[in-house]
């Protein structure tokens, strides 16, 4: 099997062309490949498939390092666009793809940046999914070590966002896994820890569902900005600094799609026997 190793701000991926080669992965195979000592090593495995809908260009599948399939990965989407362009699978600047939860448009810009239309943030608790009677801008979550206020939103995958005073000292290691597996998120959740620098600049760390804390989480950056805007804390264009680098997020509010812009880097190509 041919593959490419890529990263978006240090969030690393193995990307596989499932259009020109037949590929099938069991969860056990994915876990073995994800092992950084005995396999290739990655946060997520991305598979490019032929479109399920003839109106679209590709279908986009995402698997976490633990073998679980998920519906969205923003950093992965940028790498997906870079991959299909590099491999000559398309020459379009605007690439339309489907995911488990909907469609996306990925735009390859002239400055080497990728702009992703992430769709509209989803706030209805049942659709996140999150257990709550109605939408609120802040929810109280109780864990074994502390009670937190958080925003909850789906960007095609579930996110909870907690505001912290200092990103460096935030208790991500302990609180992250407790939020990820919190009973009010039946499909688990990506936990974001956001420090607001000003209305157009935040710092963020994300404990990702099925992957742990990563260098960057694109959908997590989108979720944090969406929550901050809904809570009246942020403007419509925000720079998000993650451990691996920065993203620009734009959102004009309810009824509008949210856009993420950032880099996608090709590291190397390889061949492995499964």
Swiss-Prot record:
Its EC number is 5.1.1.7. It comes from the Bacteria. The active site is at residues 73, 217. DapF utilizes a two-base mechanism involving a pair of cysteine residues (Cys-73 and Cys-217). It is found in: Cytoplasm. Homodimer (Potential). Previously DapF has been proposed to be a monomer, however it seems that it adopts a dimeric structure. The record marks 159, 208 as: Could be important to modulate the pK values of the two catalytic cysteine residues. One of its GO terms (molecular function) is diaminopimelate epimerase activity. Inhibited by LL-aziridino (LL-AziDAP), DL-aziridino (DL-AziDAP). Also inhibited by (2S,3R,6S)-2,6-diamino-3-fluoropimelate (L,L-3-fluoro-DAP) and (2R,3S,6S)-2,6-diamino-3-fluoropimelate (D,L-3-fluoro-DAP). Pathway: Amino-acid biosynthesis; L-lysine biosynthesis via DAP pathway; DL-2,6-diaminopimelate from LL-2,6-diaminopimelate: step 1/1. Belongs to the diaminopimelate epimerase family. Keywords: Amino-acid biosynthesis, Cytoplasm, Isomerase, Lysine biosynthesis. The keyword Cytoplasm applies. Coiled coil: none annotated. NCBIfam families: DapF. Its main location: cytoplasm. Catalyzes the stereoinversion of LL-2,6-diaminopimelate (L,L-DAP) to meso-diaminopimelate (meso-DAP), a precursor of L-lysine and an essential component of the bacterial peptidoglycan. Only accepts DAP isomers with the L configuration. Signal peptide: none annotated. It catalyses: (2S,6S)-2,6-diaminopimelate = meso-2,6-diaminopimelate. Substrate binds at residues 11, 44, 64, 74-75, 157, 190, 208-209, 218-219. HAMAP family: DAP_epimerase (MF_00197). GO terms for biological process: lysine biosynthetic process via diaminopimelate. Changing residue 217 to A: Inactive as epimerase. GO terms for cellular component: cytosol. This is Diaminopimelate epimerase.
């Amino acid at each position: 099997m041919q593959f490419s190793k890529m990263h978006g701000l240090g969030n690393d991926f193995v990307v596989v062309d499932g259009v020109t080669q037949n590929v099938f992965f069991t969860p056990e195979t994915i876990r073995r490949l994800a092992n950084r000592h005995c396999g290739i090593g990655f946060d997520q495995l991305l598979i490019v498939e032929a479109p399920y809908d003839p109106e679209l260009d590709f279908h986009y599948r995402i698997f976490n390092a633990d073998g679980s399939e998920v519906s969205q990965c923003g950093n992965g989407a940028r790498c997906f666009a870079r991959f299909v362009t590099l491999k000559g699978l398309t020459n379009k600047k605007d690439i339309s793809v489907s995911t488990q939860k909907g469609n996306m448009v990925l735009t390859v810009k002239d400055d080497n940046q990728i702009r992703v239309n992430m769709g509209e943030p989803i706030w209805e608790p049942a659709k996140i999914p999150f257990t709550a009677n109605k939408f609120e801008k802040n929810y109280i979550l109780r864990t074994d070590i502390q009670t937190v206020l958080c925003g909850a939103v789906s960007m095609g995958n579930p996110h909870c966002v907690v505001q912290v005073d200092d990103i460096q000292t935030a208790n991500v290691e302990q609180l992250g896994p407790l939020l990820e597996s919190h009973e009010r998120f039946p499909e688990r959740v990506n936990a974001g820890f956001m420090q607001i620098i000003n209305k157009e600049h935040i710092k963020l760390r994300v404990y990702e569902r099925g992957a742990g804390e990563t260098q960057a989480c694109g959908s997590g950056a989108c979720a944090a900005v969406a929550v901050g805007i809904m809570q009246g804390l942020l403007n419509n264009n925000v720079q998000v600094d993650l451990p691996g680098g920065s993203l620009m997020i734009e959102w004009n509010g309810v009824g509008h799609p949210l856009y993420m812009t950032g880099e996608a880097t090709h590291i190397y190509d390889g061949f492995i026997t499964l």
